[in-house]
From Swiss-Prot:
This is Cytochrome f. It comes from the Eukaryota. Belongs to the cytochrome f family. It is found in: Plastid, Chloroplast thylakoid membrane.
C-alpha cells in the first residue's frame, strides 16, 4: 500500500512538473515571438513598403540608429561580409512580457539586390565562420532568398551581426547585370510597442481612455493595475487595464484628461533603417583597368629614360 502511494505521488509530481515546464515554455516563446521578424514574415509579403519604409517600424515605434558595412565592390560568385551594427547601452534593461526587467534582444532584416543570397556553408571561410558564431539566418520567404532576417538574439553578444553573402554571376543569371545596386537594412533592439493586430504590448505608455477622477486603483495579483475613472458629467465610469511592466503615474483622487498618460513609457529600445550601395564588378573591366594602369606606368618610365638619354646627348654636345 505504501509503495502504491509513493507511485501515485511520483506520478502526480511528474505531471505537475511537465505542466509547469509547458506553461513556462509557452510564456517564453510568446515573449520572444511577439517582438521580432516572425511577425513581419507572417503579416507582410515584403518587409519594405513602397514608400521605402521597413515594416518593422510599425511595431517598434521609437527611432534608433543602425549601421551597415559592405565592400564598395565585389566580384561575381564571391563571398563577402555584410556587417550590421545595432548600437545601444548594454547596461540598460527592458520590460519583459511578464513585467520583469531583463536584457535587450536584437533583430535585423537585410534586403539585398535580386540574385544576392546567403552564402552556403561550404563557401564560407573559417575566418567568417568564427565571426558568425552560432547565428542562424533565415530567408524572409522561400521565394525571397535575397531577403534575410535574424532575431531575436542576445544583444549583449551580437550588437554586430555578420551576414555571409554570395554575389551572383551574370554568366549564369541573365537577370543580373554588372552595375551599382542598393542594399536596405533595418535593425531593432528591444521589444515592440504594438502588435500587428493593433493591440499594445506592455512595453509602451498607457493613456486614460476618458476624462474624469481616478476613483479606484486595483493592483492585480499577477501584476498590473485596474484604474477606474469616473466621469461625473456623463454619469459613467471606465476601467483602464494596465499590464505588468509600466509604472503608474497617477493616484486615487487625481483628475485626468482623455489620452493623458497613466503610466511612464518603459521602452528603452527602438528601430532604425539605413541604405548602402554595392557594385557588382566585371572582372574583365578590372583586368582592362590594370592593363591601362600598367601602360601608363610604362609610358612614364620610358619618358624618364628618354629624358635622361636626351640630357646625356646634350651634355656630350656641350663637352665637344
Amino acid at each position: 500500500m505504501e509503495k502504491r502511494n509513493t507511485y501515485d505521488w511520483v506520478t502526480r509530481w511528474v505531471i505537475a512538473s511537465f505542466s509547469i515546464l509547458t506553461i513556462s515554455y509557452m510564456i517564453t516563446w510568446t515573449s520572444i515571438s511577439n517582438a521580432y521578424p516572425i511577425f513581419a514574415q507572417k503579416s507582410y509579403e515584403s518587409p519594405r513598403e513602397a514608400t521605402g519604409r521597413i515594416v518593422c517600424a510599425n511595431c517598434h515605434l521609437a527611432k534608433k540608429s543602425v549601421e551597415i558595412e559592405v565592400p564598395q565592390s565585389v566580384l561575381p560568385n564571391s563571398v563577402f561580409e555584410a556587417i550590421v551594427k545595432i548600437p545601444y547601452d548594454t547596461q540598460i534593461k527592458q520590460v519583459l512580457a511578464n513585467g520583469k526587467k531583463g536584457g535587450l534582444n536584437v533583430g535585423a532584416v537585410l534586403i539585398l539586390p535580386e540574385g544576392f543570397e546567403l552564402a552556403p556553408s561550404d563557401r564560407i571561410s573559417p575566418e567568417i565562420k568564427q565571426k558568425i558564431g552560432n547565428l542562424n539566418f533565415q530567408n524572409y520567404s522561400p521565394s525571397q532568398k535575397n531577403i534575410l532576417v535574424i532575431g531575436p538574439i542576445p544583444g549583449q553578444k551580437y550588437r554586430e551581426i555578420v551576414f555571409p553573402i554570395l554575389s551572383p554571376d551574370p554568366a549564369t543569371k541573365k537577370e543580373v547585370n554588372f552595375r551599382k545596386y542598393p542594399i536596405y537594412v533595418g535593425g531593432n533592439r528591444g521589444r515592440g510597442q504594438v502588435y500587428p493586430d493593433g493591440s499594445k504590448s506592455n512595453n509602451t505608455v498607457y493613456n486614460a481612455s476618458a476624462t474624469g477622477r481616478v476613483s479606484q486603483i486595483l493592483r492585480k495579483d499577477k501584476g498590473g493595475y485596474e484604474v477606474t475613472i469616473e466621469n461625473i458629467s456623463q454619469g459613467r465610469s471606465v476601467v483602464d487595464i494596465i499590464p505588468p511592466g509600466p509604472e503608474l503615474l497617477v493616484s486615487e483622487g487625481d483628475f485626468v484628461k482623455v489620452d493623458q498618460p497613466l503610466t511612464n513609457n518603459p521602452n528603452v529600445g527602438g528601430f532604425g533603417q539605413v541604405n548602402a550601395e554595392i557594385v557588382l564588378q566585371d572582372p574583365f573591366r578590372i583586368q582592362g583597368l590594370l592593363v591601362f594602369l600598367a601602360s601608363v606606368v610604362l609610358a612614364q618610365i620610358f619618358l624618364v629614360l628618354k629624358k635622361k638619354q636626351f640630357e646625356k646627348v646634350q651634355l656630350a654636345e656641350m663637352n665637344f
